[in-house]
Swiss-Prot record:
The keyword 4Fe-4S does not apply. This is Endoribonuclease Dicer-L. Mg(2+) 2 binds at E1674, D1779, E1782. It comes from Xenopus laevis (African clawed frog). GO terms for cellular component: cytoplasm; nucleus; RISC-loading complex. Binds 2 magnesium or manganese ions per subunit. Its EC number is 3.1.26.3.
């Protein structure tokens, strides 16, 4: 047998590397890429009468339905007016309904079904006429139709298509035959389509077959076409070399073979003879035994004794299990008998050979022959790639370590538990060439043959390269239901296939399962170990040998070889007949391997340049180029686009070809080739011409390769930015990359320090209490102090005018105070002395009252960037107007208590005298403690009933006097003086948001009001001081309270001015809005848009844990942080939740009657009266009266539609002495006796004039014309980390979707020829975070952004101050921390003061010292020391959230220098920091000296833990910057900010304005009309940005804007949507026949029907020659729907929070939802595609939807029912369905002249039910839900391939199980797995009682 010559890849002349079968892309070079056979059959059927011979039923439906759809234009319309009808004939009644449902699913045709012959026989002619009138497709049994024809009820000429199912029946005598006879006489005859799957059954004689086919063709007057699945599967692949080998007989030298055979035969005969009577119910006792023994016998015969021994051993193990579980005695006996026989066989074998090694004497010749073939495939040494030495060094015995060998004495049946050794992850070097399958008949043969090959590999180095495995169908125990064990088996099979696909194994031993339908690679060796028994088996296994050089070897025993040769002849003949019937009858089998002729002479190549190496296409390579080009066009997984070439012989001899490219190629016209003298050349020549044309239009690049989407020919779109030269690590545009930017200073405040003798501006800071603190929140029952009750207030003195900005709130202890900044007078001058006085007072306010001065800051108003003065104003002289209160300023200068403690001495001679009026509005200072940093208290109450001799609250001291004597050795001179109840002056300086609400405006839970009340009423918990021991501060309490608001007011003013400046800048750059606002105009108030929920209802136990106590009024359960401590560690308000938004919606006040409103002023809507302040009315009455301004009881205040602001708009100041509007004076009853005391006229409060309902803005201006409200712009600049009452997240989402829409529309209109892949590439470049970040940076957004929490002591620079580098101590660095700022005990880390008693768990004091209320500072000091100590020791006991390891020692070599300033005080922050909020750091990095402790007077400067404490990565670069003047921002945050600003312009000024805004940023979304001056300095500007100081940025921007001479026009709809075509209109009418029904259904008639056709045309539908496919419209529609839905959600009155908004958006804008809706509204019935797989997926999906009939959630329960729990597979959602849902939106948009309203009018009714359903209950993707539920424990596996080519993903929830999901893509499988896991977890949760 040595003469066997195989052409193996290794020996092939093309060298070793040709022939790695899996490395070859299936792109053909000599023939056009073949199209799916179903597509070609359909084409044949459209062309002529056809009999389709198919193997599968499903393919038949596809062809029949699509054919009737294609011809449907003939059957729509009126039957009486010549429209025809289509008839489907089936053989039996039950097939009728199948066909009907197929037609109904895929078309909108009206279908009639007729299956009852009796019933229809009695119908009259009229009845039939009516049926034909009302139906377009009639499905009936052939008997009924024959009846109809015979009775002359209908004529065949009225039928356009007759479909015969199972048409082979026409050969016998059958109604089909008679129907055809009638057809013969009728002219014109209908088109005929015959379908059959059973031309071939079992063995049949080729002559008969041919005769049968010809007869059928004659009867049906058709041509038979076979599908390629009956001929070799890919008929274009080269045919494998077929070899039949005679293996010779087995010579049984030892006689063992015969003995074993005799044993087995005897045993089997015994079993057959035991005819135990079996009742039909019982199972046959001998069945298992017979099966096992005959399997063993078969192995013996086919493979020989060695294998029989192996299989006997396996079977014994398998039998043990049966025996163990067998209950019945008789059955057991038979099993034991079998066991004995098998053991006997094993014993006999052991006598002859040792089972350990393979002895060739004991295997059959077939096996020997097989091993010989395999040796031929051994790869050559030189093919070992780089690993030759590795190969040589391996000794043979360890070699198999990477295969799945197992030990022989492994006593687990290895079928069930194959213990695989771990495999190396790389394909073994041995697997590089062979890729083979051995087909065997029986399962056991496969198992043992595999074992044998592995054994041979160990002994024979020639075979060592084989890594084999076996796969046997799911044949295990057909008689048991599929159980866990089978599941294991199944998994194992899939693993085997996966390895074979990945070429980890190179040889597969398989039963016939692999012949059909399993996805495996192209093999280069197929061996039929057992001969094929029928044609189908022959052709299927042969079809697996598809590699370019492959062998199909059949092994025959000598006795069988004769008969098999006969069979083989038969198979060949059948194949030939079928091939001739193949729809492409040119036999192209040989063209692929034909010798290459030099055809260049015949037809010159297309060469780019005339030099040698120039790229060229020759006539021989052209087809490959075309195939490659088509493969690169965009398509879905189901469609493989291929060119279509028609070749016909011309009358005079030569051939000519016409080439049609897929319809989404820009080259649409058919290309006609030159006449050539053979068909092959004609095809090549036309390809060459096509290549030339493709290159000319730019579809092939200059190397003549297809142009990818990246090499876009539209360079101008990807405006290439100069890559910034920067050392900052991280990818530009990502969150990881962070950089520092100076904080912007508004131009109007820059250099605004007034100079002597120069005109100044004086502004009043008006403060009005608009919403007093409701009682529930006023725990201490403090008196509220409305700021407008006292006339003395603060003002701002500046050298420049300040633009109008909206009023805004601050939140003091008394409630919400509305702040206004009003110009008092301008143009006046001050002399030097006055200015110095004012400046000193200004410094005094910030350094002493607010104690914000620290070593790092220095007061230098002349140098500071921003240095206006804050000064007290009062009503001076008699004029009644406010002016600078110089007298008061001088008084303070003179006062002793100004800074320190005056040492007044009282004695018995001059005792202390108490004057009540001195204490009524006073701040007092205890004179006996804390001398360097005295504490200041407000006098809350004077206890006239207490004296120093009253009983002391705690038992240690009798009286107050005794306490002071004992503790401080102080004697009192006046024992009758009353005592004072005092409150701390506030150290909480961030008053931007209310304390009792979180950022969402939701009430924080409060601790029980009962406890509080009790606590505050007992003296123990009050601070009580003796007047004599205190000094009175010169600044009255009323003014002090206003001073506390200054940092917040100035900060907010600063931010709003920055926003106003941005608005003005945009007005110049983009032409949106006006540069300077009109004098008489003021924007509505800044407002957080919260509905205040302070109504008692909402408070009651908002935490389930706090039980509601029985007695008492309302319960408030929250834990607040005590306020007795003035710890700097606590100067911050940190909110529990940080995502929020400034709402822009108006909540109409509930329609309550007035009486209801009374007293509930603070219920849900109390914010509605936020901004009202009426001149001369005190706040209490005014707040309540304000409720009912509007006649219709709705607060009306909208500013354009989207921006609705809940507050009133305080308009222009009333002229002096203008009467108060009468709406404000309500009935006395309502005012509750609170009669208003008029305040001085000029008090800075304003009056609400009539409200304009619609515009919401006074004097007819609207934000549409003026530009957005600075408050809204500020929202767009505020990150959620700033913990303000609003942030950019909602606006950002809106901006994001509008940006996508604007850019999409622009690209769609500007590039009518670019296909979807290129468009989306350009879009992704433009909308990328990286691009937006660059544009935002160029515009200077980063400086204007608000990124961290406002914390005055830490990061606010008061006006007039500069950062002083020498003493800087806020410098530090860190690498990663969570900036959450929640304190250790989960409380909100607010400052320790204000509004609240100490909560028990936060008291550090000893219970013994309780009494020491007077001295409770001590405890604060000690607590501070403890805190600092613990910090330095590194225990972090105080603020758990800060991981100590994250501090890095300052980096000595790295200094970041701030522009044009001395080295600043700076703090170093890591690059990953997310716009950190520093407050929680404050305590550590800096302890204000003002808060230093008297005992140890130390200051902790920069805190630097020891080295080993720093777990920071050395490589991480830290950024060192100064907290006061700079901020560190992630690139992505800047991109977000740009989107939010876009959203802000969109909501305020409309879509056109938003587009202009984008253009001004540098994102082109509109065409330019003309350019007057081109801006030259823009580039220099952006590059110099980094190096400029803050001061110059603004000036730089303004220079730029002046030279923007660009005007933008409007987008134009791309001109043509139809191609030039001779009879385009007629084709269009054919193609869209029936679409009018769809137009009715969606209620939109198309003006241009071509858009409608385009929206439904899939890329595979080549019959549409007049429009493009839907991909471009889908690209457009996707963005439009996304924007419309996002906009709708954004404007929802429910005001969804950003998180919900995101979830809703992703739940509604996704393929699953769109596909479901498309099916619900019948889109699929009009869909035009020719793609068999897509057809089936849609079919499945539609059926599934009909069964479910329930709309989908996220990808909600998209799976089949639960029978098959083991292998969860999601039903596949056909992407094409979602696509046409989108493309139709794009089509409507274009057809309606780009009207979004029209699209929404059509789509809203479809989407509305879902929007409602989801808004009520927001769905989340299962993957996300699982990860949120089990964040630590859920782990997803990588994807595995299943045996049919799908993907499986396993998710393991540690401790709760593993869950698998399967789907066509990783994503689908992953969500299936997640869904199963969730179902299981939820089921388990519900069983566990709530513990």
């Amino acid at each position: 047998m040595a003469g066997l010559q195989l052409m193996t890849p290794a020996s092939s002349p093309m060298g070793p590397f040709f022939g790695l079968p899996w490395q070859q892309e299936a792109i053909h070079d000599n023939i056009y890429t073949p199209r799916k056979y179903q597509v070609e059959l359909l084409e044949a059927a459209l062309d002529h009468n056809t009999i389709v011979c198919l193997n599968s039923g499903s393919g038949k439906t596809f062809i029949a339905v699509l054919l009737s759809k294609e011809l449907s234009y003939q059957i729509r319309g009126d039957f009486s007016k010549n429209a025809k009808r289509t008839v489907f004939l089936v053989n039996s009644e039950k097939q009728v309904s199948q066909q009907v449902s197929a037609v109904r699913t895929h078309t909108d045709l009206k279908v009639g079904e007729y299956s009852d012959l009796q019933k229809t026989q009695c119908w009259a002619k009229e009845k039939w006429y009516q049926e034909f009138e009302t139906r377009q497709v009639l499905v009936m049994t052939c008997h009924i139709f024959l009846n109809v024809l015979k009775s002359g009820n209908v004529s065949l000429s009225n039928i356009n298509l007759l479909v015969f199912d199972e048409c082979h029946l026409a050969i016998q005598d059958h109604p089909y035959r008679e129907i055809m006879k009638i057809c013969e006489s009728c002219q014109p005859c209908p088109r005929i389509l015959g379908l059959t799957a059973s031309i071939l059954n079992g063995k049949c004689d080729p002559r008969d077959l041919e005769e049968k086919i010809q007869k059928l063709e004659k009867i049906l007057r058709s041509n038979a076409e076979t599908a390629t699945d009956l001929v070799v599967l890919d008929r274009y692949a080269s045919q494998p070399c077929e070899i039949v080998l005679d293996c010779g007989p087995y010579v049984d030298r030892s006689g063992l073979f015969q003995r074993l055979l005799n044993e087995l035969d005897e045993a089997l005969n015994f079993l057959i003879d035991c005819n135990i009577s079996t009742h039909s119910k019982e199972r046959d006792s001998t069945i298992i035994s017979k099966q096992i023994l005959s399997d063993c016998r078969a192995v013996l015969l086919v493979l020989g004794p060695w294998c029989a021994d192996k299989v006997a051993g396996m079977m014994v193990r398998e039998l043990q299990k049966y025996i163990k579980h067998e209950q019945e005695e008789l059955h057991r006996k038979f099993l034991l008998f079998t066991d004995t026989i098998l053991r006997k066989i094993h014993a006999l074998c052991e006598e002859h050979f040792s089972p350990a090694s393979l002895d060739m004497k004991f295997v059959t010749p077939k096996v020997i022959k097989l091993l010989e073939i395999l040796r031929k495939y051994k790869p050559y040494e030189r093919q070992q790639f780089e690993s030759v030495e590795w190969y040589n060094n391996r000794n043979q015995d360890n070699y198999v370590s990477w295969s799945d060998s197992e030990d022989d004495d492994d006593d687990e049946d290895e079928e069930i538990e194959e213990k695989e050794k771990t495999e190396t992850s790389f394909p073994s070097p041995f697997t590089n060439i062979l890729c083979g399958i051995i087909f065997v008949e029986r399962r056991y043969t496969a198992v043992v043959l595999n074992r044998l090959i592995k054994e041979a590999g160990k002994q024979d180095p020639e075979l060592a390269y084989i890594s084999s495995n076996f796969i046997t169908g799911h044949g295990i125990g057909k008689n048991q239901p599929r159980n866990k064990q089978m599941e294991v088996e199944f998994r194992k099979q899939e693993e085997v296939l996966r390895k074979f696909r990945a070429h980890e194994t190179n040889l597969l031993i398989a039963t016939s399962i692999v012949e059909e339908g399993v996805d495996i690679p192209k093999c280069n060796l197929v061996v039929r170990f057992d001969l094929p028994s029928e044609y189908r088996s022959y052709v299927q296994s042969k079809g697996r040998a598809r590699a370019p050089i492959s062998n199909y070897i059949m092994l025959a025993d000598s006795d069988k070889i004769k008969t098999f040769e006969e069979d083989l002849k038969t198979y060949k003949a059948i194949e030939k007949i079928l091939r001739n019937k193949c729809s492409k009858s040119i036999d192209c089998g040989n063209t692929e391997s034909e010798p290459v002729v030099d055809d260049d002479e015949i037809f010159p190549p297309y060469v780019l340049r005339q030099d040698d190496g120039s790229p060229r296409v020759t006539i021989n390579t052209a087809i490959g180029h075309i195939n490659r080009y088509c493969a690169r066009l965009p398509s879905d997984p189901f469609t493989h686009l291929a060119p279509k070439c028609k070749t016909r012989e011309m009358s005079d001899g030569p051939y000519r070809s016409t080439l049609y490219l897929p319809i989404n190629s820009p080259l649409r016209a058919p290309i006609v080739g030159p006449p050539m003298n053979c068909a092959r050349l004609a095809e090549r020549a036309v390809a060459l011409i096509c290549c030339k044309k493709l290159h000319e239009i730019g579809e092939l690049d200059d190397h003549l390769m297809p142009v990818g989407k990246e090499t876009v020919k539209y360079e101008e779109e990807l405006d290439l930015h100069d890559e910034e030269e920067t050392s900052v690590p991280g990818r530009p545009g990502s969150t990881k990359r962070r950089q520092c930017y100076p904080k912007a200073i508004p131009e109007c405040l820059r250099n605004s320090y007034p100079k002597p003798g120069q005109p100044c501006y004086l502004y009043v800071i008006g403060m009005v209490l608009t919403t007093p603190l409701p009682d529930e929140l006023n725990f201490r029952r403090r008196k509220l102090y409305p700021p407008e009750d006292t006339t003395r207030c603060f003002g701002i003195l500046t050298a420049k005018p300040i633009p109008q900005i909206p009023h805004f709130p601050v939140y003091t202890r008394s409630g919400e105070v509305t702040i206004s900044i009003e110009l008092k007078k301008s143009g006046f001058t001050l002399n030097l002395e006055q200015l110095e006085l004012i400046t000193r007072l200004h410094q005094y306010i910030f350094s002493h009252i607010l104690r914000l001065e620290k070593p790092a800051l220095e007061f230098k108003p002349t140098v500071a960037d921003c240095a206006y003065c804050v000064l007290p104003l009062n009503v001076v002289n008699d004029s009644g107007t406010l002016d600078i209160d110089f007298k008061f300023v001088e008084d303070i200068e003179k006062s002793e208590a100004r800074t320190g403690i005056p040492n007044t001495q009282y004695s018995a001679e001059s005792p202390f005298i108490f004057k009540l009026e001195d204490y009524q509005d006073a701040v007092i200072i205890p004179r006996y403690r804390n001398f360097d940093q005295p504490h200041r208290f407000y006098v809350a109450d004077v206890y006239t009933d207490l004296t120093p001799l009253s009983k002391f609250p705690s038992p240690e001291y009798e009286t107050f006097a005794e306490y002071y004597k004992t503790k401080y050795n102080l004697d009192l001179t006046n024992l009758n003086q009353p005592l004072l109840d005092v409150d701390h002056t506030s150290s909480r300086l961030n008053l931007l948001t209310p304390r009792h609400l979180n950022q969402k405006g939701k009430a924080l839970p409060l601790s029980s009001a009962e406890k509080r009340k009790a606590k505050w009423e007992s003296l123990q918990n009050k601070q009580i001081l003796v007047p004599e021991l205190c000094a009175i501060h010169p600044v009255p309490a009323s003014l002090w309270r206003k001073a506390v608001c200054l940092p917040s007011i100035l900060y907010r003013l600063h931010c709003l001015l920055t926003a106003e400046e941005l608005r003005a800048q945009t007005a110049i750059d983009a032409g949106v809005g006006v540069k300077s606002l009109p004098e008489d105009f003021r924007y509505p108030n800044l407002d957080f848009g919260w509905k205040r929920s302070i109504d008692s209802k909402t408070f009651i136990s908002s935490q389930s844990s706090s039980a509601v106590e029985s007695e008492g009024d309302c319960r408030l359960n929250t834990t607040m942080v005590p306020d007795s401590a003035t710890s700097s560690a606590a100067n911050h308000v940190i909110y529990t939740q940080t995502n929020d938004q400034m709402s822009v919606n108006c909540t109409p006040l509930c329609q309550k009657s007035l009486s209801d409103l009374r007293g509930v002023c603070f219920s849900e809507d109390y914010k509605a009266i936020n901004g009202v302040s009426c001149n001369g009315v005190t706040s209490d009455s005014e707040a309540e009266s304000g409720v009912c301004f509007q006649k219709d009881e709705r607060i009306a205040c909208t500013q354009e539609i989207p921006e609705k602001s809940t507050s009133f708009h305080i308009q222009n100041l009333p002229k002096e002495n203008q009467p108060i509007l009468n709406e404000c004076t309500l009935s006395k009853k309502f005012l509750d006796g609170n009669v208003s005391k008029p305040t001085s006229d000029e008090c800075p409060s304003t009056c609400t004039s009539d409200m304009q309902y619609e515009s919401g803005l006074s004097n007819g201006y609207s934000s549409k014309t003026l530009g957005p409200n600075p408050g809204l712009i500020l929202q767009a600049l505020t990150l959620s980390n700033a913990s303000d009452g609003f942030n950019l997240e909602r606006l950002e989402m809106l901006g994001d979707s509008f940006l996508k829409h604007a850019i999409t529309t622009y690209l769609f209109c500007t590039y009518p020829d670019a296909h979807e892949g290129r468009l989306s590439y350009m879009r992704s470049k433009k909308v990328s975070n990286c691009n937006l970040y660059r544009l935002g940076k160029k515009k200077g957004s980063p400086s204007r952004m608000v990124v961290s929490i406002f914390d005055p002591p830490v990061n606010w620079l008061p006006p007039g101050y500069i950062v002083n580098q020498d003493k800087s101590s806020d410098k530090w660095e860190s690498n990663e921390t969570s900036g959450e700022g929640v304190m250790a005990n989960g409380k909100i880390d607010e400052d320790f003061d204000d509004d609240d008693e100490e909560d028990e768990d936060l008291m550090w004091r000893n219970p013994k010292e309780e009494t020491d209320f007077d001295d409770d500072f001590l405890e604060y000091d000690q607590e501070h020391i403890k805190f600092i100590d613990s910090m330095l020791m590194g225990s972090g006991a105080f603020v758990k959230k800060i991981p100590l390891s994250s501090f890095a020692p300052p980096d000595q070599n790295y200094e970041w220098r701030a522009p044009k300033k001395p080295l600043l005080e700076s703090a170093q922050f890591p690059s990953e920091f997310d716009d950190f909020d520093y407050s929680s750091w404050d305590a550590m990095c800096y302890l204000d000296p003002s808060k230093a402790v008297e005992e140890d007077d130390f200051v902790v400067g920069f805190w630097n833990p020891s080295e080993e404490n720093c777990g920071t990565d050395v490589g991480k670069q830290s950024i060192s910057y100064d907290l006061h003047t700079e901020q560190c921002i992630a690139d992505k945050s800047i991109a977000d900010c740009v989107e939010a600003l876009l959203g802000c312009y969109l909501t305020s000024c409309g879509e056109r304005a938003a587009q202009l805004f984008l253009c001004s940023l540098g994102l082109k979304v509109l065409p330019q009309v003309r350019r007057s001056v081109t801006s030259t300095n823009s580039i220099s500007a952006s590059s110099s940005y980094q190096k400029t100081s803050t001061r110059d940025i603004c000036t730089l921007n303004s220079e730029l804007s002046s030279c923007k001479g660009v005007e933008y026009g409007y987008l134009k709809i791309p001109p043509r949507c139809m191609f030039e075509h001779p009879d385009a209109e007629k084709t269009l009418d054919h193609l869209i026949s029936g679409f009018e029904n769809f137009e009715k259904k969606i209620n939109y008639p198309f003006k241009n029907k071509a858009y409608l056709l385009q929206a439904f045309t899939h890329a595979s539908y080549h019959y549409n020659t007049i429009t493009d496919c839907y991909q471009r419209l889908e690209f457009l529609g996707d963005a439009i729907l996304d924007y419309l839905i996002t906009k709708h959600l954004y404007e929802d009155p429910r005001q969804h929070s950003p998180g919900v908004l995101t979830d809703l958006r992703s739940a509604l804008v996704n393929n699953t939802i769109f596909a479901s809706l498309a099916v619900k509204y019948d889109y699929h019935k009009y869909f035009k595609a020719i793609s068999p797989e897509l057809f089936h997926v849609i079919d499945d999906f539609v059926q599934f939807q009909l069964e479910k009939n329930e709309m989908q959630g996220m990808d909600s329960e998209l799976r089949r029912s639960e029978e098959d729990e083991e292998k969860e597979e999601d039903i596949e959602v056909p992407k094409a369905m979602g696509d046409i849902f989108e493309s139709l939106a794009g089509a409507i948009y274009m057809d309606s002249g780009m009207s979004l309203e029209t699209v929404w009018r059509v789509y809203y009714p479809m989407m509305h039910p879902l929007i409602e359903k989801f808004s009520a209950n927001v769905p989340r993707s299962p993957v996300r839900e699982l990860l949120e539920m089990e964040p630590e424990t859920a782990k997803f596996s990588p994807a595995e391939r299943t045996y049919d080519g799908k993907v499986r993903v396993t998710v393991e929830v540690v401790g709760k199980g593993k869950f698998k999901g399967v789907g066509r893509s990783y994503r689908i499988a992953k969500s299936a797995a997640a869904r199963r896991a969730l179902r299981s977890l939820k089921a388990n949760q519900s069983q566990v009682p709530n513990s």
